[in-house]
Amino acid sequence: MKSFRIILIVLLSYLFVGSVYASEGKGLEIATEVDIRDRGFGDTTSTMTMTLFDQYGNSTSRKIRNRTLEGTDEGDLSLVIFDTPADVKGTAFLSHTKKSGSDDQWLYLPALKRVKRIASSNQAGPFMGSEFAYEDISSQELEKYTYKYLRNEDYQGLDCFVVEYDPIDRKSGYSKQIVWIDTKEYRSHKIEFYDRKESLLKTLVYKNYSIYNGKFWRADIFEMENHQTGKKTILEFDDWKFQTGLSAKDFNKKSLKKVR
């Protein structure tokens, strides 16, 4: 009888390990397909309205321009330029995303007339007072996470994979992200962010998807809600343009002060 129990425990252990490997394999497969479907966009530009809501519902808005260049050997390059209001006009944020480790990020502050490097230890902090962290602004490279497929689930009438993304970088402000990805177009619709104590921190919802150049899906609205503070930030995108001729020289930290 004792031998039978030992055999049963061993068999159950093999089944558990097998299910974990299957979950991780399917999670990586889904995340890889998400990545593949967005390859080849080249570069993009867009305009954006960022609206910040405090816990009482009071709001302030900012007008922003965005530029992104698709990466080859490393991750994407992105540039964010603030146009209004006057107190942030001319502020520019530059990110060179890395496929492993922390990203290279710089912030130009016109009031100080200097470019400030964002230390890797500070990339979990809030971006320009919003509910988005600096690490949220960078492109989400495939190599930055390990993955676990959790289940299939309906989300607003769409059949979705639910996948856990676990950051490899220990300096990330998140212990994990739970992502809802539709099974037809492989678009992200919702992300739950958990803090380092495994508590739900924020939820990001993507709305109003449109397709460009017959292939590239972009959501026009990002809503990030902070469950621990009651604050919220909404990003509304407009005027998407693809393959505009941007190059790496347009994403140089030395020229941040001259960005127009």
Kindly give the residue locations of the regions a language model identified.
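Positively charged n-region of N-terminal signal peptides that target proteins for export
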Residues: 1-6
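Gly/Pro-enriched, hydrophobic low-complexity segments
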Residues: 32, 83, 94-96, 104-108, ...
